[in-house]
Structures are given as C-alpha cells and as structure tokens.
C-alpha cells in the first residue's frame, strides 16, 4: 500500500444528471487531470465527492474505476454511512480493492450520541476489518454534528491501535489540528482546510485533504512546493485562500464543478440532488473573480 501524504484531492464525483447514475466514463480523464496537477493522492466519496448521496453499490463501482486508473495516486476511500452495516460492507469492499486507507465519519443522523456509543461504533467497524486495515476518522462536526473527541481517539488507540491510522480534521480550527499533531504522533493528521495547508505542513501534519485541489490542483500543489523548496509560502497560501473566499459563499461542489469547465478540458458534469448547479451569472462572476486573482489584480 502507498503511504497517503502531501496534497490530496477531495475529488468530485461525476453524475450524468441530477437524478442520473454516476458518469463512470468521466473518471479516468479526471484522475489524469489531478495527477497532471501534481497531486499526491485522492480522497474518493467524501463530502466534496457527494458520497453520502450515493448508494453503497455506486460507491463500490466508483472505487473500482478509480483503482483501475489511479496511476501513482494514493487513494483514500470515504466509507462512512449512517448504518454501521453499510459502513462495514463498504469498508470491506474498499479494502479488498486495495485502497491505501479508509476515512470514516461518525454516524450522523442520531443526534447527541454518547461518546461511548460512537467509540463502540468505530470499534465494531475495526473488529469487522482485516488486522492490517488503515482506518482514518473524519472530524467535521459542522456537518455531522458529532465531534471526534479525545475520549474517542484515546479509546480507539487503546483497543485498535494497529488499525487506527490517522484523522482528517476539517474543523478549520488550527489550534485543534495542532493539538492533534502534538498529542498523537502515532497518527497521521491531515488538515481538511484549504486555508491551513501552509500551517499544517509547517506544524508537522502528514498533509492536506482539501476541496479546492479537486478543481485547482496546481494552486494547492504550489503551497506544498513553496514550503519544501524554499519559495514564497505566504504568497502561495494567500492565493489559494483568496480562491477559497470565492467558493465559500457558494455550496462547494457546485462551485468546483463549474470551475472545472475552465480549469480542465473535461466535459461538464452534473450534481446530484439536493445540490443545484450555479446559474450562468454565478459562473461568470466566479470565473471573473478567479481570473482577477490569478492576474494579481484583486485588492
């Protein structure tokens, strides 16, 4: 298995229409685009990839295509589902396909669950997987409503330390990410924030798994290269953060799928309901603002 590290795209999932199937034929070209953009790996079926809007069967087939066309990219599979049985089935399938790690969000429908129950959920998952499985937990409480607390982390390390591989922190809180990096050197900690890539690299993170790299891979890779090659890290991060500021007022997958129409040669791809595409006016405004940033004319 490859070692996930560096800049990893929270890759998009293509659909033929808002109620249609996955556009599997679109995926190989997209993976080439991400690799050509200098990325080290991909996270499939995550938040940006609309994974929770897909069936288990669709997700498995998507992973089959990705693994067949991954090239040198590492692959992390988002396998968290509301039902533990689905999470186990999808995780087993992903591991059988040879993914380098799985990323699992906590069960998100039952509100205010006890930490003991969440820990038991993750332990049951690990018990159902091979001993050498690499399990990453997904901390994105603003979406799931369920934080990955230190009690959960400590408990899973105590019981399944050989399988517990890492954590993606998408809280956007650098102090929280730094605490994880400093407190758990045995875990690979990834930031999920485009704005925190430079800080994460300087602070000892394994890398960054971010949304913008799914449509702007070269901008994200530029931060990595500047950090490792003695370049202007602040300038590279500022440019990426400025693009993030454009996307923030808009729902992320619609903005990124729109952006792909001018950052790549890929055909336009659809979103799955309940997500809606941007209007023509919104797309034009987004592109114009992006071009001003790239030209260095944005105040």
Curated annotation (Swiss-Prot):
Gene Ontology, cellular component aspect: cytoplasm
Compartments annotated for it: namely: Cytoplasm
Q: Does the keyword Membrane apply?
A: no
SUPFAM superfamilies in UniProt = Aldolase
Residue numbers annotated as active site: 47, 109, 138, 168
* InterPro entries (UniProt xref): Aldolase_TIM, DapA-like, Schiff_base-form_aldolases_CS
Say if the entry is tagged with keyword Signal. no
For this UniProt record, the keywords arranged alphabetically read as follows: Cytoplasm, Lyase, Schiff base
- In short, the EC number is 4.-.-.-
GO MF term set: 4-hydroxy-tetrahydrodipicolinate synthase activity
Record's subunit section: Homotetramer.
Give the family, as the similarity comment puts it.
Answer: Belongs to the DapA family.
| Name under which the protein is recorded | Uncharacterized DapA-like lyase Caur_1967
Q: Which organism is it from?
A: Chloroflexus aurantiacus (strain ATCC 29366 / DSM 635 / J-10-fl)
